[in-house]
Amino acid sequence: MPKLKTKSAAKKRFKLTASGNVIASQAGKKHFMRRRTKAQIRNLRGTTILCNQEGYNIKKYFLPYGTN
């Protein structure tokens, strides 16, 4: 069976932790920022851990060899 390719877009957007969780950056920071409060903008900084089902789907379909 041939090797599976990792999706390049997923490599750029997601990272795996040592325990196998999937980390992604917060959504909703690209435009329309003027209608958000300063606290909302601050809270959108950084990363978040995806829920179990989303993380499972990312690892299964987009990062086939990232199954720590």
UniProtKB/Swiss-Prot annotation:
Q: Which GO BP terms, alphabetically?
A: translation
Tell me, what is one Gene Ontology molecular-function annotation carried by this entry?
structural constituent of ribosome
Q: PROSITE patterns, per this entry? A: RIBOSOMAL_L35 (PS00936)
**What does the UniProt keyword field contain?**
Ribonucleoprotein, Ribosomal protein
Entry-linked Pfam families:
Ribosomal_L35p
Q: Does the keyword Coiled coil apply?
A: no
Record's InterPro entries? Ribosomal_bL35 (IPR001706), Ribosomal_bL35-like (IPR021137), Ribosomal_bL35_CS (IPR018265), Ribosomal_bL35_sf (IPR037229)
GO CC term, one of those recorded: cytosolic large ribosomal subunit
Q: Which domain of life is it from?
A: Bacteria
NCBIfam families of this UniProt entry?
A: rpmI_bact
The family line of this record is: Belongs to the bacterial ribosomal protein bL35 family.
Which protein is depicted? Large ribosomal subunit protein bL35
Please tell me the species this chain comes from.
Rickettsia canadensis (strain McKiel)
Q: What is the lineage of its organism?
A: Bacteria, Pseudomonadati, Pseudomonadota, Alphaproteobacteria, Rickettsiales
What gene makes this protein? rpmI
